[in-house]
């Protein structure tokens, strides 16, 4: 648990460092063009590795639990977007219109894979089902997120072409992902052996995209349009979203008769939003416009969900350990 937290903390510090560097030394002009091409290559590599790491056998092992998966997908792609729209009268005064669009983008994203599985495992939930749900959510997000973004931002007066977005996502994200899945039969063992180094590549790709995005945002005046009050309000907004979804997933899991292991999986898989997918996807979806404000809510939500879910997972694990000790004593 301490090692897991250390990794997340180091990556969070790196994210903050990259935002600071982009604020002080943003890339612009020819440098921005160079970083743009480099970012596109990094995004392709990131999704190629996602495809190469994803085990089809693990997905098949947990695929039969369709009621659980349906509930997780509903929380990810229905509950979150509905909350984003329903809370608009509360959220806009807290964060302003620009950051609110970023909150809506956050609500449209798929679940994260790695942390959902890690926390489910730590809390002693249904790990095969968590792997299947999180992986399928990530894949569905390639198609559903652009459409949800079109509907959500259209409802807020910022429309776009959903078909064009899906085409861009397909070419820049899905094609490398499928190529990675195909290549898995030859490089799967190598990927597994070098998982630690490939994690660095994953995170490095995300940091590069964040630097490029925030450089563009700083050049176009992000910190002049986003006030300290709105940043403080963003903490409140992300906390409200996470609290409502955590409460909702727990309540629905109980009401629908799932056992404890499945309820743990629903809680952790249904409440996550993927930074690894959301940052590069924003670079594709919002090309030509400053995306710093679009990914800022996601970056903050990412850290809050890790801290809160780490505490929850530890509590579930402690309760399970106490139950096992009591059973052994009797």
Description of each model-found segment:
Residues 1-91, 150, 154-260, 320, ...:
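Structural signature of multi-pass alpha-helical membrane transport proteins
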Residues 30, 221-228, 281-299:
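Extracellular/periplasmic helix-loop-helix junctions in multi-pass membrane proteins
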Residues 53-54, 277-284:
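Transmembrane alpha-helical segments of integral membrane proteins
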Residues 61, 114-126, 224, 251-255, ...:
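Helix-loop junctions at the membrane interface of multi-pass solute transporters
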Residues 66-73, 94-108, 125-135, 232-235, ...:
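The feature identifies polytopic integral membrane transport proteins across all domains of life
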Residues 75-83, 108-113, 130-150, 170-174, ...:
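Membrane-embedded alpha-helical segments of transport systems
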Residues 88-144, 149, 153-165:
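Membrane-interface helix-loop-helix junctions at boundaries between adjacent transmembrane segments
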Residues 195-201, 257-274, 280-281:
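Helix-helix packing/entry segments at the starts of transmembrane helices
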């Amino acid at each position: 648990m301490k090692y897991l937290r250390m990794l997340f903390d180091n990556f969070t510090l790196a994210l903050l460092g990259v935002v600071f560097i982009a604020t002080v030394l943003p890339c612009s002009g020819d440098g921005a063009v160079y970083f743009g091409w480099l970012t596109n290559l990094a995004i392709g590599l990131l999704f190629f590795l996602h495809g190469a790491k994803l085990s089809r056998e693990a997905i098949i092992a947990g695929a039969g639990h369709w009621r659980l998966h349906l509930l997780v997908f509903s929380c990810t792609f229905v509950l979150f977007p509905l909350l984003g729209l329903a809370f608009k009268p509360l959220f806009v005064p807290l964060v302003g219109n620009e950051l609110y669009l970023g909150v809506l983008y956050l609500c449209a994203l798929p679940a994260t894979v790695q942390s959902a599985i890690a926390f489910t495992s730590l809390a002693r939930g249904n790990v095969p089902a968590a792997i299947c749900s999180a992986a399928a959510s990530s894949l569905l997000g390639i198609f559903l997120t652009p459409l949800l973004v079109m509907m959500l931002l259209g409802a807020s007066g910022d429309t776009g072409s959903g078909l064009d977005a899906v085409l861009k996502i397909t070419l820049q994200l899905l094609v490398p992902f499928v190529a990675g899945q195909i290549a898995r039969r030859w490089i799967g063992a190598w990927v597994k052996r070098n998982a630690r180094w490939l994690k660095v590549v994953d995170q490095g790709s995300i940091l590069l995209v964040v630097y490029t995005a925030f450089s563009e945002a700083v050049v176009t005046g992000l910190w002049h349009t986003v006030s300290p009050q709105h940043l403080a309000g963003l903490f409140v907004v992300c906390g409200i979203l996470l609290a409502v979804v955590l409460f909702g997933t727990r309540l629905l899991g109980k009401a629908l008769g799932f056992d404890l292991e499945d309820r743990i999986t629903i809680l952790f898989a249904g409440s996550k939003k993927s930074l690894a997918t959301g940052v590069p996807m924003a670079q594709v979806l919002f090309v030509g416009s400053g995306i710093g404000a679009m990914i800022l809510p996601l970056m903050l939500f990412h850290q809050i969900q890790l801290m809160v879910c780490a505490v929850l997972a530890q509590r579930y694990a402690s309760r399970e350990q106490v139950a096992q000790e009591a059973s052994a004593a009797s």
